[in-house]
Amino acid sequence: MSLINLTFKKIRNEKRPVLLTYTVAGDNSKKKSLEILKSIGKYADICEIGFPHNTPIADGGQIQSSAYRALKNGIKIKDVFSIVKDFKKSKQAKP
């Protein structure tokens, strides 16, 4: 069973809602993005990390702004994977 499925099963047994958060990788800076993930990861059950792209037309205004800031700051796909890797090293087994 995947870590996400295990998390949902655990939370369902606790009879509470799941706190699933979302952030765009690289918004503000690579370092700050990791700090934000570590901070929200203390409370979130699942952390979703978005890849910034230059045509986020299906996303809302806040996510569009975050994606544009990340791209303006030079975030690359390899940086997103690096942020995720560093986050997973610093965090317990959260999806």
Where on the chain are the PLM-derived regions?
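Glycine-rich, proline-tolerant flexible connector loops at the mouths of alpha/beta enzymes
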Residues: 28-30, 41, 46-76
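Amphipathic, alpha-helical segments enriched in basic
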Residues: 8, 15, 22, 55, ...
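Short coil/turn connectors at secondary-structure junctions
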Residues: 14-18, 42-43, 91-95
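Hydrophobic faces of well-ordered beta-strands that scaffold small-molecule active sites
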Residues: 19-23, 47-49, 95
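N-terminal amphipathic alpha-helix/helix-capping segment at the start of soluble metabolic enzymes
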Residues: 1-20, 83-88
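Active-site entrance/lid segments in N-terminal catalytic domains of soluble metabolic enzymes
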Residues: 2, 25, 36, 62-95
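Active-site mouth loops of central-metabolism enzymes
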Residues: 19-35
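Short secondary-structure boundary/capping segments within folded domains
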Residues: 10-14, 27-28, 38-40
